[in-house]
Amino acid sequence: MGVEGRPLSILIVCQYFSPENFGVNAIVAELQQRGHSVTVLTGMPNYPSGVFVDGYGGWKVRRETWNGAMVIRVPIIARGRSSRLKLALNYLSYAISASILAPFLVKTRPDVILVYQLSPVTMALPAIVLKLIKGSKVLLWVQDIWPESLRATGIIKNPLIVGSVKFVVRLIYRDSSIIAVQSRRFIDFIRPLATRASDIRYLPNTADRFYRPVEVAPDATERKFFRPGFNILFAGNLGSAQGLETVLGAIMQLKDHKNIQWIFVGDGRCRGWLEHQVREHGLSDNVQILGAFPPERMPYFFALADVLLLSLRDELIFSLTVPSKLQTYLACGRPVLGAISGEAANILSTASAGLAAPPDAPERLAEMALTMSRMPRERLKELGDAALEYQRREFDRDHWLDCLEDWLRELSEQPRAS
């Protein structure tokens, strides 16, 4: 259990929030359930489709309640589906809008500010503004390393812009009292941009509680998507970071193996590209692209799949990260097929939960997919059981939530920031 004490007033800053599917949603719910008063400063939901969710948008601030937490939404520009300019405007619009409006919208001083920092890193700027005005300490939970992620995804390559982003990153790290990282390998990249006194701590992601082994009813809707044979399922964002070119290459090499089905559940900027490639190469008998489903239904998709697929592009930054998808796969006790390297591949190997090919080797991914398709059911079950055991040992949700709660309380008890 975390250190007991009075309930805290916690401001959570993140550009994305429910109904967008990110780990910050569960963090808000858990902290609220533990008796704290949580306020979320976020934008209008438009991820991953690139258009605002029905009922949102416009240029007015919106307030709502979610699981007992107060949610403040500031106006932003939607990210669009394929325009780098719109994506850049989306990134900038939240940082500017929230930084200007937050001092007026967050009327009382929070005990502590938690930034759930995904891409872009600029989403942390409103927290720094509030720290300077109200004196609250900031805990920055780094999910993506910038500017490395910016270069790796190819969104911006201009060295002047990258240099400007690096300056902003230094500013954010300097003004964060605790920097938490979701992967231990992040530390060596953060240290040169942080100050010597920066307090950097390991805080991994954990799976939401609904990610668990489940029994699927005979009449469950999810069953209609699975055909007889060997089903490989990819879940989540279909974006540039996912290395879909490698996956497509593997599918093409196994085109004649009609017993192997590739199922994609999710949406994102590269969905249209993938659908076009499937049509172009005559892969409709091998591939299904289903679109997005509620996160709570994903364990049932996972249970029906023979293997779950995890892929990332061949970039240094992606070898350092642990995609939160991996924890959800492990928590459901399913074997994993990876086109990954670095930390994620190391976890998969240590857990004995599946096989991993290099991220840029479609022929190796195809070979491993074929190998797993020929494994006895008993062997696949062993891999799934090992995945679940590793998840419970290394990514226990209550343990790491206790750590987060303790650190937030620690900052709340320190002298006012200046």
Region locations from a protein language model:
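N-terminal subdomain of nucleotide-sugar transferases
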Residues: 1-65, 256, 417-418
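Carbohydrate-associated surface elements
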Residues: 44, 185, 203-206
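Conserved donor-binding/catalytic core segment of Leloir-type glycosyltransferases
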Residues: 207, 224-242, 248-251, 263
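A charged, aromatic-enriched C-terminal amphipathic alpha-helix characteristic of glycosyltransferases
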Residues: 219, 377-408
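Nucleotide-activated donor-binding/catalytic signature segment of Leloir-type glycosyltransferases, i.e.
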Residues: 229, 265, 272-299
